[in-house]
C-alpha cells in the first residue's frame, strides 16, 4: 500500500459532493488515492469563509471518484474546492513530546500550549504485532490496589473492561492506576477520550494536574498523554481517535521499550461512531443497526493492544452497556477480547468502601492456579466464598438479628465485614480531599493479610482497624491506637 500511496502524493482532486461528514472527490485518471489515505482541503469558499479539514478515503467509487469521511465539521465546504492527496494515512506525533499534552484525532495540540517542535510522527493504521513478536507467557500486572490484585488480577498486555455508573469512583480509580504505573513501574500512560462529554475530559485534565500526573510547570516530568475526540465531533473523529491514542502508546512500547497503560473511555462510542460512518457510506446494516464490519473494526483495534518481547500495552476500557443489555452486539463483541472485568458497585460506594470494586462480580482469566499460584488462588476463592456467605446471611440478620445465627455463621459474618473493610484502601491521588496518605500494597502483603483474617488470627481486632489502610501491619498499628484512645 505504501508504494502506491507515495506515487499519488500531491495529486489534486476536486470536491464533487458533500453529504454531512461524507464527501466525494474526483481525481485525474490513474491518480486515485489509496483507501485510508488522508486528503487535505484548505482554502476559502465563494463566501470568503476559511475552510481547513482532513478527510480519510473510505471507498473508491468509479468514474475517478473516491468517498472520504471528514475528521472535523464540513461547515463552509462547497463543491469545486480543491482536495490534496497527502499520499499517506493520518499521522500523529509520538514519543516524549506528547507527554502532558492534549491532542485531537489528527495529533494537533488543543491545549493552547503551543505547537510541538521537531516531533516524530507515526501513521494511525498499522498491522497488529506478528505472532513471533508476542509475549505469550501470562504475567500478572501488579497495580498495588488490593481488591484488583487479589480477586481480579490484570494481565500485563491484557485488556480490562471497567464497568461503573456516575459517581462510583471510576475516574479516581483510573487516576490511581496511572499514578501507580508511573511510580512503581516507571511507565507512561495514554488516555483516549472517545465520544464522551467534553466537560468530563476537561475535568479529568484538571484533576490530573492537581494530582501531579501532569506537571504543568515542567511537561517533561508528566507521565500521561491525552487524545480526545468527544461527543460533539463528527463520527469520523470519534471512530479514529482510539487509533490515534493507540499509536502513541505503541511508540512507547516498541521504541522506548516501556510498559504502557492505555485508557479508552468509552469503547462503546468507538463502535457507535463506526456504525454512523457505515450508514453514511451506504453499507447494509447488520444486527440492531450496527455496521456489518463490527467484528473486524473492534478486532483491528483490540489486536494491536498486546504484550510484545519489547514491552506491553495494558488497556483499561470503560464499557457502556446500552439499556443494560449485555447481549447487545457492541458490548458482546468487546467482551470476547477482555481478559478481566472490574465492576464498580454503587452499594459499596454508599458504604464508604473505596475503591468500590465489587469483589463478587469482578472477574479475571488470570485467576487460576497455573498463573497466579496455589496460595493466591486459594486465598482469593476463600475471600469470595466468605463474602458470598455473608451476602446470603444478610436477609436473616435483617429479620432475626445477628444473635440468631450459629456460632460458625457469626464468625463468618465478623470476618466478612473485616474483609470488606480491608478491601478498601487510601489512594495517592485522593490525598488532597481525604487527608490520608496513599498506599501501594505489594501482592504478597495482600495475600498474607487476607490469609490472616480468614484463619481467625485477627478475630480479636476491632472491625474499624481494617478500614482504609494498606497492609496488615497498619491494621495492627491502627488497632493499638484505637485501644489506647479507648483507655484514655
From Swiss-Prot:
Pfam families: ATP-synt_ab, ATP-synt_ab_N, ATP-synt_VA_C. ATP binds at residues 164-171. It is a peripheral membrane protein. It is found in: Cellular thylakoid membrane. Coiled coil: none annotated. Transmembrane segments: none annotated. One of its GO terms (cellular component) is plasma membrane-derived thylakoid membrane. Belongs to the ATPase alpha/beta chains family. F-type ATPases have 2 components, CF(1) - the catalytic core - and CF(0) - the membrane proton channel. CF(1) has five subunits: alpha(3), beta(3), gamma(1), delta(1), epsilon(1). CF(0) has four main subunits: a(1), b(1), b'(1) and c(9-12). HAMAP family: ATP_synth_beta_bact. This is ATP synthase subunit beta. It comes from Prochlorococcus marinus (strain NATL2A).
